[in-house]
Amino acid sequence: MSGLVKAKRYDWKDSNLAMFGSALDKSVKKESALKEAAWKGVGEKVGLKIWRIVNFKVTEWPEKDYGSFFSGDSYIILNTYKLKGREELAYDVHFWIGSKSTQDEYCVAAYKTVELDAYLDDAAIQHRDAEGNESDLFLSYFENGLTIMEGGAEMGFNNVKPEEYKARLLHFSGLKKHIVVKEVPLCPQRLKSDDVFILDLGRTLYQWNGTGSNKDERFKAMQYLQNLKAERGAATSKTLEEEHIDKSHEFYTSLTGEDEDLPEDQTDSAAVKTLLRVSDAAGHFKSTVVKTGHIAASDLDSKDVFILDNGSTCFVWVGNGASAQEKRNGLGYAHSHLMKTPHPLIPILRHQRGQASKCFNAALAA
């Protein structure tokens, strides 16, 4: 692969992930997975592990930073757990793609996710989560919410003195434990009355509560503000209510940046639930619509691979009788399918027949 060059964000049609799929059966084997140092000893006990892709390599992400990611990076997340009433370990492995991650990083993260599954004897349910479109399962891993900062991890989280600090605007949105904290451009167009924002000016911190914001967003922002003050010592903070402050306030006059077209939630509420049979037997990706609307487990055939797309999640169901290559290519199939839809960034969940997936069962029943 060529060197890492920052590409146009989420330019899925130019991504080479589709090509990555055709090579998986040949190159992702248990033997090669055993040679990856990052996988040594993983999946042997219940818990969460996270890695970041750095120069095509899998590097361990510090546990203290779990739940904090950079939009310029790609990560792999492994959750090891036990199903109720069972002793054997079960696995969900995700790769998370930042909005400014490169195409190369995207492909390496996808490839290594499949390799990790091979290391775990193909026992994992595979997921793709894109920034701004994370699944509820992904968000559930982080009790303190998900924090997404601009740039890459080489910038560090807490290594800048307050007097040298570059102003930033943090957006708090969500409910209960599913609060997402995201750094957004310093521009007034980013403000939303139903959310909470923190303006970080280094020694001065403002919490802006939108008129329609909820108590969970306000509480999370307050906690975040307290942590920033504790880190910086001399910093002062003030809480502002949208309906009570004038546009001449420093909070507003500090928002002088330009807006960017960052990815938003792409859930397609108008989408019709669709079941497709997929294959690459002819040497290229091919999908055939089997059914739309009401879909049942009886519509699935264990000899094939199917995609179930309901507009909010793209499920890949792999039958036990599918070929080895088809079993490996689930993520590539889903990527190729989603490229052609209005919702290319929705979560992907790939699992095999017999693996427990409450999300898939719920999608069938809906």
Swiss-Prot record:
InterPro entries found in the cross-reference section:
ADF-H/Gelsolin-like_dom_sf, Gelsolin-like_dom, Gelsolin-like_dom_sf, Villin/Gelsolin
Glycoprotein among keywords:
no
- An annotated GO BP: actin filament capping
Compartments it resides in? Cytoplasm, Cytoskeleton
Q: Which PANTHER family match?
A: SEVERIN, VILLIN
UniProt subunit comment: Interacts with actin monomers and filaments.
Annotated function: Calcium-regulated protein that binds to the plus (or barbed) ends of actin monomers or filaments, preventing monomer exchange (end-blocking or capping). Can promote the assembly of monomers into filaments (nucleation) as well as sever existing filaments.
Q: Report the protein name in the record.
A: Gelsolin-like protein 2
Q: Which gene encodes it?
A: gelsolin
